[in-house]
């Protein structure tokens, strides 16, 4: 893109002078023990990072990026990975940090990592050696912070990672089915960094190193802090209540009074006086030094409509070019959330990914297998961010809507490093992507629009005319990468946004011809307009167009390749009829899904707001605004999931029962247009056996009152009568001896 963005940082990420400890030189791995610190010549760590993941020195792991970034700034950084949280001892293994503790639950939310969408316990953990579950606690951010405070009470604790990022305000917690306070309040940490943390982390570390107390560091973007009142010099907008139209003054009648010149007298011209020219300072932009006061925690917990209102405001204040600060009351204090950080430039992204990662797990794990690492060890991350804005996804809220791309040279250098240094490389790059495969180098063509836009999605309901959809940079990158010596294949495993891809068929041709290993993942998520409108996903027309082009180019290349669509069940806005129509679509197109996903209400997502409140935060919120149907309850969620697997005989009884209740009994049978087969004789006998009335057998001697009783009542009455008879037998006098 030729135009220069108006969203620029105050200073470059790598422009800070290095901390004095840079004299110790580089570290092969960031130390996890005192022995490693001794080998590096360190007597202490300046910063200690605590994480719920195993330490893998790879740029796909957040703690590796943060640790290497801080080490490049000259700080001595240690890592405590998956500590024993039963006491404070494991949190003291590296000694007392000179500056602060950085705490994260890991690459995933600890609750999502631990529980399924049906709140069932998982028995594995892909971020743990040997896939062992139970190595991190529930709500790991809270637990780790508590132990850090117990270990060293006077050391600041800074929260980060996706778990803290998505819980920075009062939020609905699916696992406890209630609204919880901001994690910053519950944890009693000193600061929270949300989103990608390079900029705020580096700035805060240097300011702490220069002696500034953390209580006075309150102006850093991408951070949240606890305050007693609004920061000085900021003006506020009160949005604690729903907007209501005020009193409208009557419009004066233009001919109600005589005008000054109505007497037709000539008006003497006024003599213009010379005035000195004064240079006016530029007017401040309306979002500068402005905060929005959200409804308090107590209000959003007690009023679902106000919760939806607060959620809507938060999602509209995410553009770093025009976002205002947010403030939310929790008891007698406030959570103050600064505007998002300025996205990294291409040069800064290149520098971050050029840090000396070893691209392997820490040697302390030996030969243990870490599934998350196995998945990404031959993949390359080419960009960050996503402007899709899907309601159920947290990527936009975490990484931002502006795409941050690496340069072509930087990506090629990383591919060559994988080829030359990573053990077990066979010549196949497993993925060249990011949150979305085909958003590389795509940005808004209008700098002014990019700076001021508050749209939740750049592609829904239609692709914005300002959005650049030219895939030529991506195509050139693919071609250069696959021409490298020693590279046999470049696969694309990240999801493809097909509604953007159809705008540039050249990309689809390149993809189908060279970069698909038989199957390509895409995510229509649903086929019906009701749920799609709540998901902010395109209709099936874009999917059909993409499939047509993909099949055509695959055939031209002489390859037999298939699309694997992903769907979500039980999403807000999805009725039983919608799921039946989706199941019929799947059967018509001969799809039999093995893995299906029920909607998982994660914190901060718009879909989670719909799930909890029954309101639509994508439109203006009011007590009489649009209600959203929400499939809740285990039975209905099981049904929606079962309909995605209509071909599984175990789901047929549940589907038949639902079809009969909906008046769609014609979909049960052996005809081609039927969804499930009719029950067999054995199934009908088994159903009758299970539904058989278990009332006891009656005779003509059974009292009429007992006959009218239900089985439970009859059993209770029989038990009472038996007790009375036994009591009477005990009170009866004994017969005289010899009578």
UniProtKB/Swiss-Prot annotation:
<dbReference type="InterPro" id="IPR024560">
    <property type="entry name" value="UPF0313_C"/>
</dbReference>
<keyword id="KW-0408">Iron</keyword>
<dbReference type="GO" id="GO:0005506">
    <property type="term" value="F:iron ion binding"/>
</dbReference>
<feature type="binding site">
    <location>
        <position position="390"/>
    </location>
    <ligand>
        <name>[4Fe-4S] cluster</name>
    </ligand>
</feature>
<dbReference type="GO" id="GO:0003824">
    <property type="term" value="F:catalytic activity"/>
</dbReference>
<keyword id="KW-0949">S-adenosyl-L-methionine</keyword>
<dbReference type="Pfam" id="PF08497">
    <property type="entry name" value="Radical_SAM_N"/>
</dbReference>
<feature type="compositionally biased region" description="Polar residues">
    <location>
        <begin position="704"/>
        <end position="725"/>
    </location>
</feature>
<feature type="domain" description="Radical SAM core">
    <location>
        <begin position="372"/>
        <end position="650"/>
    </location>
</feature>
<feature type="binding site">
    <location>
        <position position="386"/>
    </location>
    <ligand>
        <name>[4Fe-4S] cluster</name>
    </ligand>
</feature>
<dbReference type="InterPro" id="IPR020612">
    <property type="entry name" value="Methylthiotransferase_CS"/>
</dbReference>
<feature type="compositionally biased region" description="Basic residues">
    <location>
        <begin position="729"/>
        <end position="739"/>
    </location>
</feature>
<feature type="binding site">
    <location>
        <position position="393"/>
    </location>
    <ligand>
        <name>[4Fe-4S] cluster</name>
    </ligand>
</feature>
<dbReference type="GO" id="GO:0051539">
    <property type="term" value="F:4 iron, 4 sulfur cluster binding"/>
</dbReference>
<dbReference type="InterPro" id="IPR006638">
    <property type="entry name" value="Elp3/MiaA/NifB-like_rSAM"/>
</dbReference>
<dbReference type="Pfam" id="PF04055">
    <property type="entry name" value="Radical_SAM"/>
</dbReference>
<keyword id="KW-0411">Iron-sulfur</keyword>
<keyword id="KW-0479">Metal-binding</keyword>
<dbReference type="InterPro" id="IPR007197">
    <property type="entry name" value="rSAM"/>
</dbReference>
<dbReference type="Pfam" id="PF11842">
    <property type="entry name" value="DUF3362"/>
</dbReference>
<dbReference type="InterPro" id="IPR013704">
    <property type="entry name" value="UPF0313_N"/>
</dbReference>
<keyword id="KW-0004">4Fe-4S</keyword>
<dbReference type="InterPro" id="IPR023404">
    <property type="entry name" value="rSAM_horseshoe"/>
</dbReference>
<feature type="region of interest" description="Disordered">
    <location>
        <begin position="685"/>
        <end position="739"/>
    </location>
</feature>
<dbReference type="InterPro" id="IPR022946">
    <property type="entry name" value="UPF0313"/>
</dbReference>
<comment type="similarity">
    <text>Belongs to the UPF0313 family.</text>
</comment>
<protein>
    <recommendedName>
        <fullName>UPF0313 protein YgiQ</fullName>
    </recommendedName>
</protein>
